[in-house]
Swiss-Prot record:
This is Pyruvate synthase subunit PorB. Keywords: 4Fe-4S, Iron, Iron-sulfur, Metal-binding, Oxidoreductase. Heterotetramer of one alpha, one beta, one delta and one gamma chain. Binds 1 [4Fe-4S] cluster per subunit. The gene is porB. The lineage of its organism: Archaea, Methanobacteriati, Methanobacteriota, Methanomada group, Methanococci. Disulfide bonds: none annotated. GO terms for molecular function: 4 iron, 4 sulfur cluster binding; metal ion binding; pyruvate synthase activity; thiamine pyrophosphate binding. It comes from Methanocaldococcus jannaschii (strain ATCC 43067 / DSM 2661 / JAL-1 / JCM 10045 / NBRC 100440) (Methanococcus jannaschii). [4Fe-4S] cluster binds at C19, C22, C47, C218. Its EC number is 1.2.7.1.
């Protein structure tokens, strides 16, 4: 088996304020290992922004700008246009490929920042958008987002005898972005770092708008021990709850197919946000995932 050689350079410094076992920090570290120093980051308000930039400190060793919840993609669009103008009018960076990358959580991407993201994709800006998906507004107190999974409990979708947690299915952001007709979209998970890094490398080699949705388990919001972050992510993929695939120029491809999908029960039972589920609830979720996987060819 050929193992990918990870770059030794670190452009995401240690010492951030993230929780022990934080998945968002892994997203940033792996992303920058591929993107390298010639990168400009726009970062929406959220966990990653708050934990990496407590004034006057920063974990970012590349140019970085904090944006509001709603405009990371719009800011990246402006930076991309400015870089093009500087190259054209002043000859600056003429011999360099500058990577413009926007990063936002699921709340800042699928909800509050969706309009700006859709506009940036539709206009064809040469940017990469990374959605780090921890499936709720974790920074502000674990409120539900449109990326919160069906029946997961949050502070605004609590579980009780009548309401079984979140009552809506998780928004399929990657397929929504694919519907924009952009050249590259993909899903990834921090528990499969080689898959994620290959997708980042491919995305940055393609001209035009790109989108990658990265599942990153959250020890605080999901309710599991910090040392289980990678295991939880693997179970999300092995059960088919979060499939790994890419769509390049309209061509769909599964990038990891479990030899035999594990029961969703193994994934759900490890997390406190699902502790209210009955056997009937779990069977309902299993049926939904089975149908989804059949549609994708898993």
């Amino acid at each position: 088996m050929i193992v990918m050689q990870f770059p030794r350079e670190e452009y995401f410094a240690p010492g951030h304020r993230g929780c022990a076992g934080c998945g968002a920090a892994i997203v940033a570290r792996l992303l920058l290992k591929v993107a390298g120093k010639d990168t400009i980051i726009t970062n929406a308000t959220g966990c990653l922004e708050v934990m990496t930039t407590p004034y006057p400190e920063t974990s970012w060793r590349v140019p970085w700008i904090h944006t509001a919840f709603e405009n990371a993609a719009a800011t990246a669009s402006g930076i991309e246009a400015a870089v093009k103008a500087l190259k054209r009018k002043r000859g600056k960076f003429a011999d360099k490929k500058i990577n413009v990358i926007a990063i936002g959580g699921d709340g800042g991407t699928a909800d509050i920042g969706f309009q700006a993201l859709s506009g940036a994709m539709e206009r064809g800006h040469d940017i990469l958008y990374i959605m780090y998906d921890n499936e709720a507004y974790m920074n502000t107190g674990i409120q539900r987002s449109s990326s919160t999974p069906f029946m997961a409990a949050t502070t605004t979708s609590p579980a009780g005898s009548k309401i079984r947690g979140e009552d809506r299915p998780k928004k399929d952001m990657t397929m929504i972005m694919a519907a924009h007709g952009i050249p590259y979209v993909a899903t990834a998970c921090i528990s499969y770092p080689e898959d994620f890094m290959r997708k980042v490398k491919k995305a940055l080699s393609i001209e035009g708008p790109k989108f990658i949705q990265v599942l990153q388990p959250c020890t605080t919001g999901w309710g599991y021990p910090p040392e289980k972050t990678i295991e939880i992510g693997r179970l999300a993929v092995e059960t088919g709850i979060f499939p790994l695939y890419e769509i390049e120029n309209g061509e769909f491809r599964i990038t990891y197919k479990p030899a035999k999908r594990k029961p969703v029960r193994e994934y759900l039972k490890m997390q406190k946000r699902y502790r209210h589920l009955t056997d009937e609830d779990i069977e309902r979720i299993q049926k939904y995932i089975d149908e989804k996987c059949k549609l994708l060819g898993l």
